[in-house]
């Protein structure tokens, strides 16, 4: 099977476009903003910000503002691994508790960033 139009950006754009829509991203930029938010979650925020810099000329200013807030934060899978590894060394007996809380912390951090982005979208 060969699907050249199917990429990580396309999949993440479709999945996270719901959040971009809810935050108030203009309709023409929803999928691009969703792809950036998904890339932040899967890879990290630095890669997503670098991609956004290259798209800056094509995006609506409101999209840039909302997406900047949505990308701000360390809620991604690599940060959860760093948390488990770093704090797990300080308290090795609690490593399983950290692993259980890692996903919840990821969701909470993501929702906090998305709430800030939504408020920015309301005020713009």
Go through each PLM region and give its residues.
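Transmembrane helical segments that form the transport core of multi-pass membrane transport proteins
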Residues: 1-56
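C-terminal transmembrane helix pair
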Residues: 40-124
């Amino acid at each position: 099977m060969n699907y050249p139009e199917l990429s990580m950006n396309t999949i993440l754009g479709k999945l996270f476009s719901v959040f971009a829509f809810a935050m108030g991203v203009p309709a023409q930029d929803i999928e691009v903003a969703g792809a950036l938010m998904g890339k932040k979650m899967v890879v990290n925020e630095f890669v997503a910000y670098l991609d956004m810099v290259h798209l800056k000329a094509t995006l609506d200013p409101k999209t840039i503002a909302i997406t900047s807030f949505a990308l701000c934060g360390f809620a991604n899978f690599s940060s959860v691994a760093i948390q488990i590894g770093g704090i797990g060394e300080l308290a090795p007996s609690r490593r399983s508790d950290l692993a259980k809380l890692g996903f919840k912390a990821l969701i909470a951090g993501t929702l906090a960033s998305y709430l800030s982005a939504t408020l920015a979208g309301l005020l713009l």
